[in-house]
Amino acid sequence: MSDEESFVILGSSPCSSLMPDSSLRSDVCGNAQEAEETVASTSTQPPTVNCIPVSITASQQQHKSLDSGSSQQQSLATSFIMGEIQSDVLKNSVYSQFPSLCSLQGSAEEVVKLQNMMTEYLALKSTLDKVNQTMLNYHNLTQQWRQEAADREHQYKEHVKECQAQIAILRVENQELKRDLETKIEQIEGVHTIRLKEQDELRKSVSEKQSLIDNMRVEIDKLKQLNHSFEFVPEYATESKSQELIKKMQLDINELKARDIQKQEVIKGLQIQNDIYRRDFEMERADREKNAGEKDQYLMDLRSLQRRNQELIEALAESHKASKACSTASPLSSSRSNLREEQRPILDPTGASSRTSDTTLRCPICSKSFNALSVLQSHVNDCLDKN
């Protein structure tokens, strides 16, 4: 029995194409002829073993029983190797096919057949153990690849979720900073408008007072000129009036100067406050630019992660193809070619990538679903550029 025929044991019964009746009968007839030749040769030699020869008619009857019960023997051998039946059942089957063994009377032909059968069974069992071990190794390797692919996919999904959460937080902070900045700008503009109005009023008041002082000086000069043309009056009367007028005007001038000093102090305070607001505005603008730079960095990191994800997927597909090529070049490829389609294990090295492509992919920004990873990446880049 060859290695190719040994794989039939995996099923419940052997294929008719692999074990035809004509071939079985020809093998039985050939074995019968060999047994007859062995008996003829041993009859010419002195007996060395205490055994009684069996007649030719009994040998022919055993061949007929072997021909009719070959399928049952094959099934019992398969069940015994697979551990489905006990050794006693197989012994009873052998004794039923070789009745001479029960009476300790066996021909050389039966002994040779029994030895060949046991040799074939042992070789078949060893081959099945090797095939089962190989298939178990392939199964473990496939499970390991699938688990690694699932772990990578889970890690990438978690990282995308973290990036999405950070983007959402930065977006909220950006909106809050914009609102605060707009509010402060409005306050600064309102305060600046009020200060401009006060400065205009102060300028008008100072200009009015200055014009009044100039007019009074002109009047004083005119009065001095007219003083020479008029008749001299008592000096003490005119001097007292003029002194009172000068004192009064001096008081007005001092009062205007004091108000001017107060307004200047108010203007300085407003300028200091304006400088503080300006510094706050510049700091906020710097923070906003910093946040924009961090956002660009996060976008670059996200795109690099997407490229790295694509490279890993392509590398995984290439490794699956390489493993598939190696598996087809193994020495067991010739043996597996004779398996039936329902008995042949199907190894799909690209199963992880196909399951990844069959699952629905969603955009982390707009939650739009896609079927292809490349389309999703281009859409995510467009969404990030829009935002």
Swiss-Prot record:
Residues 60-331 form a coiled coil. It comes from the Eukaryota. The keyword NAD does not apply. The keyword Glycoprotein does not apply. Residues 302-332 are annotated as: Leucine-zipper. Zn(2+) binds at C363, C366, H379, C383. Pfam families: CC2-LZ (PF16516). It is found in: Cytoplasm; Nucleus. Keywords: Coiled coil, Cytoplasm, Immunity, Innate immunity, Metal-binding, Nucleus, Zinc, Zinc-finger. One of its GO terms (molecular function) is zinc ion binding. Residues 325-337 have a biased composition (Polar residues). A zinc finger (CCHC NOA-type) spans 355-385. Residues 324-358 are annotated as: Disordered. One of its GO terms (cellular component) is cytoplasm. GO terms for biological process: defense response to Gram-negative bacterium; defense response to virus; immune response; innate immune response; negative regulation of stem cell proliferation; peptidoglycan recognition protein signaling pathway; positive regulation of antibacterial peptide biosynthetic process; positive regulation of defense response to virus by host. PANTHER family: NF-KAPPA-B ESSENTIAL MODULATOR. Interacts with IKKbeta to form the I-kappa-B kinase complex. Essential signaling component in transmitting the lipopolysaccharide (LPS) signal leading to cact degradation, which is required for NF-kappa-B (Rel) activation. Required for antibacterial immune response. This is NF-kappa-B essential modulator. It comes from Drosophila melanogaster. The gene is key.
